[in-house]
Swiss-Prot record:
May contribute to the transparency and refractive index of the lens. Heteromer composed of three CRYAA and one CRYAB subunits. Aggregates with homologous proteins, including the small heat shock protein HSPB1, to form large heteromeric complexes. Inter-subunit bridging via zinc ions enhances stability, which is crucial as there is no protein turn over in the lens. The lineage of its organism: Eukaryota, Metazoa, Chordata, Craniata, Vertebrata. InterPro entries: A-crystallin/Hsp20_dom (IPR002068), ACD_alphaB-crystallin (IPR037882), Alpha-crystallin/sHSP_animal (IPR001436), Alpha-crystallin_N (IPR003090), HSP20-like_chaperone (IPR008978). GO terms for molecular function: metal ion binding; protein homodimerization activity; structural constituent of eye lens; unfolded protein binding. Keywords: Acetylation, Eye lens protein, Metal-binding, Zinc. This is Alpha-crystallin B chain. GO terms for cellular component: cytoplasm; nucleus. Belongs to the small heat shock protein (HSP20) family.
């Protein structure tokens, strides 16, 4: 029986392509493909599991993106399976909480019910009272708030020399 041996330098460089897919990633719960059930070496010693080939599966999952730009903080969350009445967005302490739930209903594969909750830490320079949310026609929920503009001018900080060692060792002469 022939056994394919891959050299460590080759395997290490492309480990993410050869290694098994991570089960507990953001698109957990989506359907699996037949190729996911086998290690790549079973299918062929030269078979690669390119992550970008799974793009359609990723697009259909509830992807989340958080951005901290110069003038604003924003969250984009795919909630296309929920109506506005099934979504709740609230500020609780230093967090934005987004909750979506719909009861069992029929889709093209059978019956499905969905329930999710996500929490995002509000940056310290964003006023929680200024946060707004909107839902696009294609099902993307956007939660955003302006960042406070700091008018702190740039300045040089002088370095002073201390006589006592910081780590408790005697200074070298």
């Amino acid at each position: 029986m022939d056994i394919t041996i891959q050299h460590p330098w080759f395997r290490r460089q492309f480990y993410s392509f050869f290694g098994p897919n991570k089960m507990f990633e953001q698109c957990f719960g989506e359907h699996i493909q037949e190729a996911d059930l086998f290690p790549s070496s079973v299918l062929s010693p030269f078979y690669f599991k390119y992550p970008f080939l799974r793009l359609p599966s990723w697009i259909e999952s509830g992807l989340s993106e958080m951005r901290l730009e110069k003038d604003k903080f924003s969250i984009n969350l795919d909630v296309k399976h929920f109506s506005p009445e099934e979504l709740k967005v609230k500020v609780s302490g230093d967090f934005i909480e987004i909750h979506g739930k719909h009861e069992e209903r029929q889709d093209e594969h059978g019956y499905v019910s969905r329930d999710f909750q996500r929490r995002y830490k509000i940056p310290v320079d964003v006023d929680p009272l200024s946060i707004t949310s909107s839902l696009s026609p294609d099902g993307v929920l956007t939660v955003c708030g302006p960042r406070k503009q700091g008018d702190v001018p740039e300045r040089s900080i002088p370095i002073t020399r201390e006589e006592k060692a910081a780590l408790g060792a005697a200074p070298k002469k």
